[in-house]
Amino acid sequence: MAIERTLSIIKPDGVEKGIIGKIIGRFEEKGLKPVAIRLTQLSKAEAEGFYAVHKARPFFGDLVKFMTSGPVVLMVLEGENAVARNREIMGATDPKKADAGTIRKDFATDIEKNTVHGSDSAENAKIEVSYFFPEVQVHAYEWKKLA
């Protein structure tokens, strides 16, 4: 299995609900360890740059407005098949279509306020991680499992 890194964002609705720890715990329980974490308020320019791929889509303005409406938690998660595992833990983009036990099914309210973002491919993960975290800010470490 390949050890990968992926970007995960706890969106403003997740921060506002006070579930940061619960979300990080779900990733850790499934073998994804955070190797970089930052709580920040995205600027309009940062959000527009990050979501530039959606610029022509009708929801772009609302997405940028939402992502700048409050603090977010930016994380780099590391583990075996991190991209696919992260997406499995998050669940479908639309919480109504997400499987039971996923973050979006359990915490999200709708497709716009769906609590978390995760990279959709290994290629995009590299781009997204580098957008928010220069390599120097990412710290590798080994887990010591509790007995």
Swiss-Prot record:
PROSITE patterns: NDPK_LIKE (PS51374)
Pfam family, one: NDK
UniProt GO cellular component terms: cytoplasm
GO molecular function: ATP binding; metal ion binding; nucleoside diphosphate kinase activity
Keyword NAD: no
Cofactor(s) required for function per UniProt: Mg(2+)
EC number of the protein: 2.7.4.6
Similarity remark: Belongs to the NDK family.
Function field: Major role in the synthesis of nucleoside triphosphates other than ATP. The ATP gamma phosphate is transferred to the NDP beta phosphate via a ping-pong mechanism, using a phosphorylated active-site intermediate.
PANTHER family in the cross-refs: NUCLEOSIDE DIPHOSPHATE KINASE (PTHR11349)
Protein's name in the database: Nucleoside diphosphate kinase
Protein's organism: Anaeromyxobacter sp. (strain K)
Organism phylogeny: Bacteria, Pseudomonadati, Myxococcota, Myxococcia, Myxococcales
